[in-house]
């Protein structure tokens, strides 16, 4: 099951996150009752405060770990001002998969290992958090051949012991 992306709308004071919780909490419970797991993919808006709390913290509190997991996106955590490794640790046990996406100067997506995210820490925390899948995701290759970018990301991961 999926729900399209919605961004943080400061004009609405984050009201749509309240709406999301109200609408999707029963959905998450129904999925759980039927042996499925509801997943949430973050962007940068979840690292803004709404009513004095980061949205991602509120989501983690409102949905129990057995109701909703997170597909943490390392790039968007960093764009939002967070530390991806720290958030992997905070959401431990709720991250069956994470999106590996590197961050380059100027808010650009980069090949894994060529930006400024400390992936050695990310890998360490992901292992401790019980993450089973780390998925390379580079939405924008900034004019480069996407297959070349994928190969360089793959080579970086292999250099860190992943096959």
Question: Where in this protein do the model-derived segments appear?
Answer:
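Active-site acidic/histidine proton-transfer and metal-coordination neighborhood
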Residues: 1-69, 147-148
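Histidine-acidic metal/acid-base catalytic patches
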Residues: 37, 50-72, 76-163
């Amino acid at each position: 099951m999926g729900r399209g992306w919605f961004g943080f709308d400061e004009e609405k004071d984050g009201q749509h996150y309240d709406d999301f919780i109200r609408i999707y909490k029963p959905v998450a419970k129904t999925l759980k009752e039927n042996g499925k797991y509801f997943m949430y993919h973050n962007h940068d808006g979840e690292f803004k405060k709404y009513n004095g709390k980061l949205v991602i913290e509120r989501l983690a509190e409102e949905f129990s770990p057995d109701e909703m997991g997170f597909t943490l996106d390392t790039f968007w955590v960093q764009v939002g001002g967070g530390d991806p490794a720290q958030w992997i640790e905070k959401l431990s046990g709720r991250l069956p998969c994470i999106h590996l996406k590197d961050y380059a100067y100027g808010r650009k997506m980069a090949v894994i290992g060529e930006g400024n995210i400390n992936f050695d820490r990310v890998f360490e925390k992901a292992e401790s958090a019980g993450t089973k899948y780390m998925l390379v995701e580079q939405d924008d290759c900034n004019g480069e051949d996407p297959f070349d970018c994928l190969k360089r990301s793959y080579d970086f991961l292999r250099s860190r012991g992943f096959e």
